[in-house]
C-alpha cells in the first residue's frame, strides 16, 4: 500500500486522554472492503439448502394416464416438476460457498477498515478498563466516562475476558478477542474501541500493509 497517512488516535487512560500517532492507509477503497466482506459472508454460509429432483421424490414412475384418447394433456409420472409435490428443476443442492481471497487483499481490507474509523474520529484506544471486573453495570459506568452512551453501535476488541463478559449483554456492543478483529464487524458497527494489546495484535497482523 503506497499511500500512508499519520492518524492521531485518542488513547483513554485512567490518568486522562492522550494521542497516539499511527500509520494507516490514506485512501479507503470501498470495493476492496466489499470484496473482503463478501468473502467473509461466503465462508459463513452453511450451504445446506437442498431440493429433490423428479428422480428423488417419493412417487411411482408410472404414467398417470394413457398418452392418447383421454382428452387430457399428455403427462408422464406424477413426480414431474409441473405437479405440486413433484421434483424441482435446477433447485439448490448442498455446496461449499467459500473461496480463496489473497492474504494481501485481506490485510489491506483490515487496515483500510480501521483507517476509515480513525478518519471519522470513531476509533478509541484504551489503556485500561478501570473498574470493570465482569459486571455489566461496571462496564456501563466506564462507558459513560468514555463518552459511549449506547446511541451508536460499538465494536469492542480486547483480550480481557472480564471486560468482554461485562459488555456482551448490551445490545449495542459487539465483543471480539484481538485475533478475531475482522472487516465485516468493523463496517457493521459505528465505533471501534480497542485496548492497547489488541492494537498491537492488529499492527502485527497488517504487518507493513499500512
Curated annotation (Swiss-Prot):
UniProt similarity note: Belongs to the universal ribosomal protein uL4 family.
Gene: rplD
GO cellular component terms, A-Z: ribonucleoprotein complex; ribosome
Keywords on record: Ribonucleoprotein, Ribosomal protein, RNA-binding, rRNA-binding
Organism: Thermus thermophilus (strain ATCC 27634 / DSM 579 / HB8)
Record-given protein name: Large ribosomal subunit protein uL4
HAMAP family: Ribosomal_uL4_B (MF_01328_B)
PTM comment, free text: The N-terminus is blocked.
SUBUNIT field: Part of the 50S ribosomal subunit.
Role this protein plays: One of the primary rRNA binding proteins, this protein initially binds near the 5'-end of the 23S rRNA. It is important during the early stages of 50S assembly. It makes multiple contacts with different domains of the 23S rRNA in the assembled 50S subunit and ribosome.
Top-rank lineage group of the source organism: Bacteria
UniProt key word Ribosomal protein: yes
Disulphide linkage map: none
InterPro entries: Ribosomal_uL4, Ribosomal_uL4-like, Ribosomal_uL4_dom_sf
GO biological process: translation
